[in-house]
Amino acid sequence: MSRPVIVALDLDNEKKLNELLPKLGKPENVFIKIGMELFFNEGPKIVKQLSEQGYQIFLDLKMNDIPNTVYNGAKALARLGITYTTVHALGGSQMIKAAKDGLIAGTPIDKNVPKLLAVTELTSISDEILHYEQNCNLSMNDQVLSLATTAKKAGADGVICSPLEVKDLRQKVGEDFLYVTPGIRPAGNAKDDQSRVATPLQAKEWGSTAIVVGRPITLATDPEAAYEAIKKEFN
């Protein structure tokens, strides 16, 4: 089974979405990430429509609230036909457990329960921000390890983390966990707003379960060719 390459759709409306999606290939061959911008503009209906068309969907809303609110939010998201969704690991173990319970409760009987991924530290967070703004005295690796360990114990299926941290996490948190990594840039591409980045080949070698790639695919002259090239490099 090939490892997923997930296309980050950093778009804000359905018109732009409909212009891009046909350029990526057949729906059954495409795994997409929908974030806050598109979801908040177009609403849950767009997610359900895309799921019904055959797209695999990572709905990345990074829920972070009191457990009861997150439970009900996750329960609603589970009805949309998504494959992955996210919470912030910093929300704590009770919130993570509530999200997992909500996904189970909301999933239709004939569907698979979406995988719950906990966001550790965003790939835009540098060591300076971690130490001087978040007032965290741990190293980045130790902070991510702590958050990942908490998330696994609370019932999360995996974490969102930098590819730079995957090898260490696999050794210390375990192989029976998903390690989904943004911050992927093919060689020669600009880092944009990411601080901790790697190439698809490096992510493969370090053990990422799946990678998330946005602009190097969506802004390419031939998005489908760029997508297929990254899939090949990662698998």
UniProtKB/Swiss-Prot annotation:
The active site is at K62 (proton donor). Disulfide bonds: none annotated. Its EC number is 4.1.1.23. One of its GO terms (molecular function) is orotidine-5'-phosphate decarboxylase activity. It comes from the Bacteria. It catalyses: orotidine 5'-phosphate + H(+) = UMP + CO2. One of its GO terms (cellular component) is cytosol. Belongs to the OMP decarboxylase family. Type 1 subfamily. Homodimer. This is Orotidine 5'-phosphate decarboxylase. It comes from Lactobacillus johnsonii (strain CNCM I-12250 / La1 / NCC 533).
